[in-house]
């Protein structure tokens, strides 16, 4: 998918990886970039507008834990303005295994609910034009950081959901792929809580090993968007973009 002249909704587009990805996206010249985030950041929005004045950058406050009906209401406003949306990026995430319910609500349920809401406008069975979903998951969905099992499991769930979305594309007209960053130097990683405090230094220990910058991750994210491969499981790690081949251990045969 060429980003130029497209309409993109980016959930959590002002976070660590999110903001650098938003910067790279506006450089590529979409028609509209609509950012949905829990916390407004007027300085960041102004910066994005300045990077490419031809791009219309819009912000709406959004909490991914709201009911689906609330998200549909917000999307109605956005679709009324844009008429069409080409790409939805689900990027909301927290890393704090003290907050068990919220971790699941943000990292998994929020992704499911936001995707479910946009189906009201995209699903070809409802007369929709289809669309593309890019879900930010994590390499911990492949193999857990076992000291944060709740976070890791929430990302594995989001990855499984995304893989199913891709398989449903012939029915819905909506394609999907996952973005799975490795350890990236963001405020999220510097200090966070392990489950039951099994390892108080888990963030510090991770940063003792090779990592990547948010810019490296963002640049590869844009490459994945441009590749636009339904069902792709993209690993964005150590500055590289790798297509992961998923090993099938079981099949429902339906």
Curated annotation (Swiss-Prot):
<dbReference type="InterPro" id="IPR002425">
    <property type="entry name" value="ADH_Drosophila-type"/>
</dbReference>
<feature type="binding site">
    <location>
        <begin position="10"/>
        <end position="33"/>
    </location>
    <ligand>
        <name>NAD(+)</name>
    </ligand>
</feature>
<comment type="subunit">
    <text>Homodimer.</text>
</comment>
<comment type="similarity">
    <text>Belongs to the short-chain dehydrogenases/reductases (SDR) family.</text>
</comment>
<protein>
    <recommendedName>
        <fullName>Alcohol dehydrogenase 1</fullName>
        <ecNumber>1.1.1.1</ecNumber>
    </recommendedName>
</protein>
<keyword id="KW-0560">Oxidoreductase</keyword>
<feature type="binding site">
    <location>
        <position position="138"/>
    </location>
    <ligand>
        <name>substrate</name>
    </ligand>
</feature>
<keyword id="KW-0520">NAD</keyword>
<dbReference type="GO" id="GO:0004022">
    <property type="term" value="F:alcohol dehydrogenase (NAD+) activity"/>
</dbReference>
<feature type="active site" description="Proton acceptor">
    <location>
        <position position="151"/>
    </location>
</feature>
<dbReference type="InterPro" id="IPR036291">
    <property type="entry name" value="NAD(P)-bd_dom_sf"/>
</dbReference>
<dbReference type="InterPro" id="IPR020904">
    <property type="entry name" value="Sc_DH/Rdtase_CS"/>
</dbReference>
<dbReference type="GO" id="GO:0005737">
    <property type="term" value="C:cytoplasm"/>
</dbReference>
<dbReference type="InterPro" id="IPR002347">
    <property type="entry name" value="SDR_fam"/>
</dbReference>
<dbReference type="Pfam" id="PF00106">
    <property type="entry name" value="adh_short"/>
</dbReference>
<dbReference type="GO" id="GO:0006066">
    <property type="term" value="P:alcohol metabolic process"/>
</dbReference>
């Amino acid at each position: 998918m060429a980003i130029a002249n497209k309409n993109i909704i980016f959930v959590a587009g002002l976070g660590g990886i999110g903001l650098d990805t938003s910067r790279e996206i506006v450089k590529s010249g979409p028609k509209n970039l609509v950012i949905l985030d829990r916390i407004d950041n007027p300085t960041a929005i102004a910066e994005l507008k300045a990077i490419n004045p031809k791009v219309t950058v819009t912000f709406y406050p959004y909490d991914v834990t709201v009911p689906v009906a609330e998200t549909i209401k917000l999307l109605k406003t956005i679709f009324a303005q844009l008429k069409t949306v080409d790409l939805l990026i689900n990027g909301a995430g927290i890393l704090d295994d003290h907050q068990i319910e919220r971790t699941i609500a943000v990292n998994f349920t929020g992704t499911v609910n936001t995707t479910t809401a946009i189906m009201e406008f995209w699903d070809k069975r409802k007369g929709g034009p289809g669309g593309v979903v890019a879900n930010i998951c994590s390499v911990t969905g492949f193999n857990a950081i076992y000291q944060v099992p709740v976070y890791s499991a929430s990302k594995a769930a989001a990855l499984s959901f995304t893989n199913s979305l891709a398989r449903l594309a012939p029915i819905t007209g909506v394609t999907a792929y996952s973005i799975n960053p490795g350890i990236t130097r963001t405020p999220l990683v510097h200090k966070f809580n392990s489950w039951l405090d099994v390892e108080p230094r888990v963030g510090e220990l991770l940063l003792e090993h090779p990592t990547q910058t948010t810019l490296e991750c963002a640049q590869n994210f844009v490459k994945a968007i441009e590749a636009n491969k339904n069902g792709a499981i993209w690993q964005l790690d150590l500055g590289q973009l790798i297509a992961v081949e998923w090993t099938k251990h079981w099949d429902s045969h339906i």
